[in-house]
């Protein structure tokens, strides 16, 4: 049962104490806060439920640091918003100014509300006709919530801090700052924090660039500050999805791990910081440019949610994010009366034809798509204005008469043809961008973000950024998209964003506009989806340049990378799934050699890699032999058998000792069955490859492990040096307990590098 309790006591030094304990038993998660006197709260526990919650009141005496020589009279024990007034000597985490002068605030708590908020929906899942089925439960969602009101009366700044323990076990905190005085209050940065244990001594983040997103990097969590920030209007490739700390060597299946994420699609920072005097903190927030957000008397600014996830290993950390995102989307469907549906198999035309659109080619491609089992046909860039290449036309969201003339070979005719084949129709847009060589820019040069009236920011891909904070520009973009969605019967929008947003100043106000621009993007997403119930939108940003809980709450999927080379995708997919559930990660079967790397790979490898995401095709099937089309159809048919379970499954990754291999899986919620993928990226040091562990199963159950029933002919994939048959690679498989599979595992087949095989695990 969901629990929140408040306790009162007195510290050994006479300080009055208040403690709040919150628990979500079903999620095996809890947190505890202690308020020393009227100070802001400290996290004193974040992890598994406690057996004696009333003892959290004692944590002040148990954990508060002593005063030490050569320092202040009080040794810092960081609150949720560390400031110098509480002896924090680290980086500035609360940057506000009045009349250009920085304020050093000391907040005094005036009210603490700790309650279970009964709001939102809860769901029950049952199996119907072999697939998961959801229904809305009668009881509302129960969320333990702490709301703290605090104020610096002299400085005329009020703080309202809210913390929730979600049913998934995620902890969400945000702060609202209100100007209670005269004169404009400028907001620079409000970086909230979670305290972490002393043995959380290693940091894991991701970095990357175009075509190589979310590459993991580790380092010791030493004294000092480590930060990953993005100041180009989106999270971008180098920003980290999560900042995770844990016991040295933590992995997907082991180690206490504490992760933080800023749920925001604009400028932000995630950081880990440790001082010589006190415990470490992780946290983050939005970063604002000078003059960007200013509050007049009575006005407020609210930070994005800072979200924390605890787990025994990264798999559990990720599962909490997946559960949260899935519920948000389930709520949207229920609230708007939209029936849920399986993730349709997509064909996107980009790597098939690029800008070379014509009716005959794309209708023929649609025919091949139908043969391959495709259910959604998406026309990519090149259908509008003067958009014959990437140097012109962006912003002119009218159908090009040069490419799609009115008549029986128009874009409307193509949409009708696609719909007539039983497919959904999708179309590419890049609403936030404009080419200087466009009618929109020529007619409205003031509709772009730029630092001065006479100078544009540096171009990227021959593009500038539309000022969506300008109501006229917003109305034009929204109106053009709304009109086309209605006229063409568009079921799906691929929304792209291909320029780093720099020198982001609105001509309308003369002030930086990153914050307002991000809110405008959220608004146009929700406006379009509300106006066209059932419309789905994919978030793409030069591939995976904008992936965060902000955009994930309103987009229906993300494009993980412009690189569909399956060798590169193996880790891109793996680390994207730390935040994003598989059914929301666009994974496409591309050509061989891959367009982005020129690496040749087998069709089996490409299909097996795409199998664990929102499966699609980005490949000119008109040039492929019928044998390949038939094989593709077999794989899409197999994917359709499992995709509804993938959308509720627990995603697991194994910590393979061999750096040359990857083991990934999707386990049913009741652990009755699972599908795993073994990928041999390069040659292994051992020959054959060592046994691999299969995490996530019921340790006490017996399972049958066998190959998945698709074209995984080892005779075509083996190394060919006379190896013997693999004992369990038969239709009958082998029976083992879940504990055995997780402890010492199973021997994978000997296959060439850049190959992958799938196998199923079924409880008997």
Predicted features and spans:
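Polysaccharide-binding surfaces and accessory modules of carbohydrate-active proteins
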Residues: 3-10, 15-20, 29-31, 40-273, ...
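Carbohydrate-binding surface patches
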Residues: 27-30, 242-243, 656-699
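Short Pro-Gly-centered flexible turn/kink motifs
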Residues: 107-109, 120, 293-312, 754-760
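Conserved, mostly hydrophobic/aromatic
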Residues: 175, 298, 347, 418, ...
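Aromatic-lined carbohydrate-binding/catalytic grooves of carbohydrate-active enzymes
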Residues: 338-479, 492, 503
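Active-site neighborhood of glycoside hydrolase catalytic domains
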Residues: 409-410, 442-604, 614-619, 623, ...
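C-terminal beta-sandwich/jelly-roll accessory domains of carbohydrate-active enzymes
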Residues: 683-764
């Amino acid at each position: 049962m969901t629990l929140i309790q408040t306790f009162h006591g007195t510290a050994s030094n006479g300080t009055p104490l208040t403690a709040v304990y919150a628990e979500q038993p079903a999620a095996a998660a809890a947190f505890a806060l202690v308020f020393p006197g009227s100070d802001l709260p400290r996290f004193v526990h974040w992890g598994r439920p406690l057996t004696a919650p009333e003892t959290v009141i004692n944590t002040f005496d148990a954990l508060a640091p002593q005063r030490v020589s050569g320092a202040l009279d009080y040794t810092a024990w960081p609150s949720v918003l560390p400031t110098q007034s509480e002896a924090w000597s680290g980086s500035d985490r609360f940057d506000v100014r009045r009349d250009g002068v920085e304020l050093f605030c000391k907040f005094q708590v005036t009210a603490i509300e700790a309650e279970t908020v009964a709001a939102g929906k809860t769901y029950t899942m049952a199996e119907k006709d072999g697939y998961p089925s959801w229904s809305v439960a009668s009881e509302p969602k129960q969320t333990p919530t702490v709301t703290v009101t605090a104020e610096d009366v002299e400085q005329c700044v009020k703080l309202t801090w809210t913390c929730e323990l979600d049913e998934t076990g995620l902890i969400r905190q945000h702060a609202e700052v209100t100007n209670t005085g005269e004169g404009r209050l400028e907001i620079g940065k409000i970086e909230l924090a979670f305290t972490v244990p002393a043995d959380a001594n290693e940091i894991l983040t991701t970095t990357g660039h175009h075509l190589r997103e979310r590459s993991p990097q580790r380092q010791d969590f030493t004294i000092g500050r480590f930060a990953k920030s993005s100041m180009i209007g989106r999270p971008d490739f180098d920003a980290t999805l999560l900042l995770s700390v844990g016991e040295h060597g933590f992995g997907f299946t082991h180690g206490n791990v504490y992760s933080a994420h800023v749920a925001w699609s604009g400028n932000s920072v995630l950081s880990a910081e440790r001082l010589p005097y006190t415990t470490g903190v992780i946290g983050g927030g939005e970063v604002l440019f000078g003059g960007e957000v200013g509050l007049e008397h009575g006005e407020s600014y609210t930070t994005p949610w800072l979200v924390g996830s605890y787990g025994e290993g990264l798999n559990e950390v990720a599962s909490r994010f997946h559960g949260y995102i899935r519920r948000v989307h389930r709520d949207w469907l229920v609230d708007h009366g939209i029936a849920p549906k399986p993730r349709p198999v997509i064909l996107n035309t980009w790597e098939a034809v690029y800008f070379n659109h014509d009716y005959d080619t794309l209708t023929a491609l649609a025919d091949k798509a139908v043969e391959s089992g495709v259910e959604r046909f998406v026309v990519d860039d090149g259908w509008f204005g003067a958009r014959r290449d990437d140097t012109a036309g962006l912003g002119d969201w009218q159908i090009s008469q040069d490419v799609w003339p009115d008549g029986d070979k128009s874009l409307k005719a193509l949409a009708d043809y696609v719909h007539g084949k039983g497919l959904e129709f999708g179309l590419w847009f890049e609403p936030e961008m404009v080419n200087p060589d466009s009618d929109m820019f020529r007619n409205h040069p003031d509709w772009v973000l730029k630092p001065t009236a006479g100078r544009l920011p540096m171009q990227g891909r021959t593009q500038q950024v539309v000022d969506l904070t300008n109501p006229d520009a917003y109305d034009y973009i929204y109106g053009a998209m709304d009109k086309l969605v209605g006229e063409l019967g568009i079921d799906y929008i691929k929304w792209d964003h291909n320029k780093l947003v720099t020198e982001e100043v609105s001509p309308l106000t003369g002030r930086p506009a990153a914050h307002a621009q991000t809110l405008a993007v959220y608004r146009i997403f929700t406006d379009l989806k509300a106006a066209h119930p059932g419309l789905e939108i994919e978030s793409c940003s030069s591939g995976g340049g904008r992936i965060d809980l902000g955009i994930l709450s309103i987009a229906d999927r993300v494009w993980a990378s412009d690189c569909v080379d399956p060798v590169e995708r193996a880790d891109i997919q793996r680390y994207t799934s730390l935040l994003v559930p598989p059914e929301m990660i666009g994974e496409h079967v591309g050509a061989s050699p891959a367009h982005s790397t020129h690496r040749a790979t087998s069709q089996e490898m490409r299909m097996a890699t795409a199998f664990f995401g929102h499966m699609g095709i980005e490949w000119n099937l008109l040039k492929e032999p019928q044998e390949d089309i038939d094989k593709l159809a077999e794989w899409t048919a197999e994917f359709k058998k499992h995709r509804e379970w993938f959308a509720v499954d627990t995603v697991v990754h194994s910590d393979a000792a061999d750096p040359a291999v990857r083991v990934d899986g999707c386990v049913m919620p009741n652990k009755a069955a699972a599908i795993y993928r073994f990928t041999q990226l390069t040659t292994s040091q051992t020959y054959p490859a060592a046994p691999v562990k299969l995490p996530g199963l019921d340790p006490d159950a017996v399972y049958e492990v066998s190959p998945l029933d698709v074209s995984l002919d080892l005779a075509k994939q083996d190394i060919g040096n006379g190896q013997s048959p693999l004992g369990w690679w038969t239709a009958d498989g082998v029976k083992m307990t879940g504990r055995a599979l997780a402890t010492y595992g199973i021997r994978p087949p000997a296959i060439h590098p850049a190959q992958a095989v799938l196998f199923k695990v079924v409880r008997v």
